[in-house]
Amino acid sequence: MRVLHCFDAENARLGASDIARRSDLPSSTAHRLVVELTSVKLLERFADGKYGISTHAWETFVRANPLERLRLQAQSILGDVHDEMGQYVSLAVPDFSDRTILYVERFDAPDSYIRILGRHASRLDVHTTSSGLVMLAFASPQTIKAVTSTPFKDSITGEITDGAAVAAMLPEIRAKGHIVFVGGLVPENTAVAAPVVDRKGLVRAAMGVVARTGEIDVNHVTSTVLDACQKLSLRLQKDAIY
């Protein structure tokens, strides 16, 4: 996995020495792993000698990953919200063990002036995002206790936030059923997010809308997001996999 984690949107093709450096593995070990991953078609070697994630890997991971099923279930609902709002809309899932969220789908605003940090297939901290906070608020008491038991460190700014301060925010978010987050990671933005739950009431995802503060009708966006999350929750509850 250390080899596969070397690749991202900005580093889609890497040489063997780059992989060794980025994975912090000895050159001989990195080279051996690259050869093995190429032999089983998880990596592809290009004409310039560099490597990248193979089409076969993408096909295998997408076909077998339940997140792709969730993404497809949500796509039309997200699209409807995007068409109505004309703003950035996203779907994220929690990774409470890592205290992060993972963005699995997004629709961008038609204009590019709004600054957005949440990218498709990228992670952000659970405590600095509207989607992260609303999912944590709807997590089990045991999960909340575990996640907030130690201070949080912002992966972007390095700022430390007391876990108890985050925990204190959650009851109000849960009572309201959503969060309106003004500022946050991008000071000029306002985000609205709500949870998506399965048939057992477990939080599976969160849907969020982000716009520039002052250019958003919070009440209308909140109503739209809550309605969309209810629709997606009902879809999941009818799906035997959830």
For each of these PLM feature ranges, what is it?
Residues 98, 176, 199-200:
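Residue-level recognition of short loop/turn positions
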Residues 1-14, 79-105, 227-242:
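An N-terminal domain-start capping segment
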Residues 192-199:
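A short, hydrophobic, proline-anchored segment that marks a local hinge/packing element in signaling
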Residues 1-67, 233-234, 238:
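N-terminal helix-turn-helix
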Residues 52-150:
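Amphipathic alpha-helical effector-binding/dimerization core
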Residues 155-156, 187:
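Intrinsically disordered, low-complexity polar/acidic regions
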Residues 163-176, 180, 185-188, 203-242:
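Juxtadomain coupling helices with adjacent low-complexity linkers
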